[in-house]
Structure formats: structure tokens, C-alpha cells
Amino acid sequence: MIKSFFIVKKKPSLTQDEFLRYWKEEHGPLAAKLIPGLRKYVQCHPVKAAGLEFKIDGIGEIWWDNFDSLQNYFTWRQSEEAKMLIEDEKRFIDMSETVRFFAEEHVIVNH
């Protein structure tokens, strides 16, 4: 199993609530519909609690069956079909602050 992690920050013009609503209700379904080979897609939204502040606005996680599926995603990302999703990301994510990480999962505990 291969996982992609995307650490995202919102555009400064958006409130936290606007950003999270758009990401979950608009962008999430679009990504699920357009990204080929997607096994699982999760959005991690920050917990609102007194005293908690974060330097990021969320983490996206995408699961891939194998390295070939991930490679196909990279190829797709350069295609005409991906432009709609990429343009949508630019609407609400500060792309200059996005950090991407790709990893092979090794489960240590799974209760």
C-alpha cells in the first residue's frame, strides 16, 4: 500500500470554516470523481479546542494499491483531464505552502 499525504494551508482570503467546507463539500467529491486509481481519500480537519492552534489547515491522505497506481496518478496529473482538479485546488489552497509526502505504509498496530 502506498499513501500520499498533502499538508495544506488555506488561501488567506478564506476563513477556516469557508476553507474546510469547500474542501469537504466541493473539492473532495470532485477529487473522488476525477482521480484514477484512487483506493481511499481522507481529509483530516483540525480539532477546534481551547488552546489548540496549528500552523496548517489540514492534511489530505490518498491511498494507492501499489507503486504503479501512484505512477499513473503522476502521469494523469500532467494530462488535460487533471486541469479541472488542479484549477480547483488553486481556488482555495495556498499552493506555495503545500507539502507533499509519498510513503509505503508499514502497519505496526492495527486494533
What does each model-found stretch correspond to?
Residues 1-111:
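Macromolecular interaction modules
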